[in-house]
């Protein structure tokens, strides 16, 4: 399972979805789905834009969690 930490990162920085969308040019719906961990696919350019904007590495944004067998 892949866990997205966008909501945690945005919460720590007190960022709003609308502000991130406006500042990055990423569709608000895309950010909302990532924030709520409902996104099933995310374009690499979106990930790159978010990492650049937030000044984080991809490993800070996403984490692979092993599920029990």
Predicted segments, located by residue:
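DNA major-groove recognition helix of helix-turn-helix/homeodomain DNA-binding modules
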Residues: 45-60
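Phosphate-coordinating loops and pocket residues in cytosolic domains that bind phosphorylated ligands
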Residues: 22, 36, 63
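Recognition helix of helix-turn-helix/homeodomain-like DNA-binding domains
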Residues: 26-41
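The alpha-helix within a helix-turn-helix
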Residues: 10, 21, 51
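Short, charged recognition helix plus adjacent turn
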Residues: 33, 62-69
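A short, Lys/Arg-rich alpha-helix, primarily the initiator
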Residues: 1-18
